[in-house]
């Protein structure tokens, strides 16, 4: 059978930062309307805004039975650390697949039993979706990990896959290679991934509407969504590691250091903007369907670093996100940045042409 780490409970009032208010919706949810509605995953919701569960906020990690028992507590401790740093807004479920198909199937069954018991999703319908071939189904994370191992490539993925209609942040992940000793990768990479995914929860948590189109618009362009998650994950992990607040993980065969990681991103930016995406500008990378959307991660991370350098004294948590739903993304961004989006794009374009030492100079030290 699958294993689940113990539930860790924290009071929400102790952790909310900067007067944060809203909770997030899911990209899985259809446009919200008052009354009962059907969501893309087959479940139903009865409100047009996210409903925060009463009581304390729980953080739960569920791991497939073929994973080492240490994996769940490490991820849970990391999520709790991220929650202390950025705020814990509403319940978190983090589901982690291994490599074994049977163990993966058992984890899907556990997930669907949980949904059915809570009255959120019929067990049979849940199994049809999550054990099937749909994109982002739970079992797809097991399959991707197994395929990566068979091919000798340490590919991995994780995602925040909902669920606003249930009032929780739900994540799924392929096997964390560094935490499990495969390919001799540093466990810090997996820690960073957890931070990256949790920042997506933070982003969603300031949006109350369940209207899917409105949520997508309020989240902002790809470079901001993914760049923000990547940069905040990098600095969040580095800061808490320096303070001794993160669990110990396998070192792997090479060090995972903040400045080095940001340097690698500069190589990716320089290559990307001189290759197939030559002539593109940062603010043109708005959609995941864009062939250049992968640049949104590296260029976006540096854009957020540049933004925070230009707005010294401000933070996204205190000064941007609390105004987001009222103002809309672009107005909130321009008010935060103190300049128009076009002016920001021009400034970033000039900044990114600087030498590597000049670019690295804006980064914090840990």
Predicted features and spans:
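Bacterial N-terminal signal peptides that target proteins for export
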Residues: 1-7
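Bacterial N-terminal signal peptides
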Residues: 8-18
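Bacterial lipoprotein signal-peptidase II cleavage site
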Residues: 20-31
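N-terminal low-complexity, Pro/Thr/Ser-rich intrinsically disordered segments
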Residues: 31-63
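Acidic/histidine-rich, surface-exposed loop or edge segments in extracytoplasmic proteins
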Residues: 50-69, 174-180, 285, 327-330
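Zn2+-dependent metallopeptidase catalytic core
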Residues: 63-158, 191, 195-198, 205, ...
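Zinc-dependent metallopeptidase catalytic helix centered on the HExxH motif
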Residues: 150-262
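Acidic/His/Gly-enriched intrinsically disordered linker/tail segments
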Residues: 214-298, 310, 320-366
């Amino acid at each position: 059978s699958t294993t689940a780490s113990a539930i860790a409970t924290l009071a929400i009032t102790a952790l909310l930062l900067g007067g944060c208010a809203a909770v997030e919706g899911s990209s899985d949810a259809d446009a919200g309307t008052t009354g009962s509605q059907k969501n893309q995953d087959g479940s139903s919701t009865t409100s047009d805004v996210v409903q925060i569960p009463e009581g304390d906020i729980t953080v739960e990690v569920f791991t497939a039975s073929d994973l080492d028992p240490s994996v769940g507590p490490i991820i849970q401790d990391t999520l709790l650390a991220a929650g202390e740093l950025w705020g814990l807004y509403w319940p978190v479920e983090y589901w982690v697949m291994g490599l074994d198909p049977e163990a993966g199937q058992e984890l899907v069954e556990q997930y669907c039993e949980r949904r059915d018991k809570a009255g959120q999703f019929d067990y049979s319908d849940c199994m049809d979706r999550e054990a099937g071939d749909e994109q982002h189904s739970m079992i797809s994370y097991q399959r991707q990990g197994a395929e990566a191992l068979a091919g000798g490539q340490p590919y991995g993925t994780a995602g925040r896959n909902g669920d606003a209609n249930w009032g929780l942040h739900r994540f799924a992940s392929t096997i964390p290679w560094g935490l499990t000793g495969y390919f001799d990768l540093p466990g810090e990479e997996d820690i960073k991934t957890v931070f990256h995914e949790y920042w997506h929860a933070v982003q969603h948590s300031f949006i109350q509407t369940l209207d899917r189109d409105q949520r997508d618009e309020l989240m902002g362009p790809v470079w901001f969504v993914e760049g923000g998650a990547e940069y905040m994950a990098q600095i969040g992990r580095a800061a808490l590691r320096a303070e001794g607040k993160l669990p110990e993980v396998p070192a792997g065969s090479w060090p995972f250091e903040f400045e080095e990681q940001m340097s690698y991103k500069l190589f990716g930016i320089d290559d990307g903007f001189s290759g197939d995406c030559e002539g593109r500008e940062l603010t043109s990378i708005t959609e995941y369907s864009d062939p250049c959307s992968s640049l949104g991660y590296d260029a976006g991370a540096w854009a957020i670093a540049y933004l925070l350098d230009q707005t010294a004294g401000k933070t996204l948590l205190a000064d941007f996100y609390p105004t987001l739903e009222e103002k809309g993304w672009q107005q909130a961004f321009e008010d935060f940045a103190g300049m128009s989006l076009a002016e920001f794009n021009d400034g970033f374009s000039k900044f990114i042409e600087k030498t590597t030492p000049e670019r690295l100079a804006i980064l914090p030290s840990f």
